[in-house]
Amino acid sequence: MTGGDPRAARVRAVLAGHRGDESEARSLLGDADVGTRRAALGALDRIGSLTTSDLQSALKDTSGSVRRRALEIAAKRSDVEIGECLYDSDPAVAETAAFAIGERTETTAVPSLVAMANDHEDALCRESAVAALSALATVGEVDRAAILTCLLGVMNDRPQIRRRAVLGLFQFDEAEAEEAVQGALADKDRQVRAIAGDLLGVVTD
C-alpha cells in the first residue's frame, strides 16, 4: 500500500486511466485510500486492462465502496461470478449486485433475487431485485412462474417497489398479471397509477 496525500493519489489514478498508463493505475489498486482504489479500478477498466483476477479481488475488498465499483464494472462483463454479492452485509453492495445481475440477464439468480425482493430488510435492495426480475422476465430460459408470483406478491410493498412491479407485470399475459396492472390504476400512490395508465393507454389523475 502507498502513503501520502490521498487526493494526489486519486488524481494520479484518474490521470492514469486517461493517459493509458496501466502500470501507474495497477500500482494504486492496493492503495490505503478507498477512493484511490476505486479510481484505479475505473482507470484499468477505461484502459481495457482490468483482468478477471483484478475484479475478483475488488469484489472482496474490505470497503463496500470498492465492492460497489467492482460490481458496476462487472455489470458489463461476464467473466466473474457475482451471485454471492447479493448476500453482502452492506445493503448498498447487495443492491448494486441485483442491478448488475439484471444487466447481465443471469437467469440462474432468479431464486436469490426472489428471496431478496420478498425478504430483504432494505427497501432499496427489494426495489433493485424487483427491477432485475422484471428485466429477466423477458429472457427465454427463465422461471417466469417464480418471477410472476414474486411480482404479484410485492404489490403490497412500498410505492417505489410497486412501480417497478407494475412494469414487470405488464410483460406477462397471464390473467392475474393483467388484473394486477389494471388494479394499479386505483393504487393509492399517484406515480403507480400514472405508470399503469401509461402502459394501458388510460388517462389517470
Kindly give the residue locations of the regions a language model identified.
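Structural detector for internal amphipathic alpha-helices that build alpha-solenoid repeat scaffolds
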Residues: 2-19, 27, 35-49, 54-57, ...
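HEAT/HEAT-like alpha-solenoid repeats
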Residues: 21, 65, 92, 110, ...
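TPR/TPR-like (Sel1-like) alpha-helical repeat modules
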Residues: 185-188
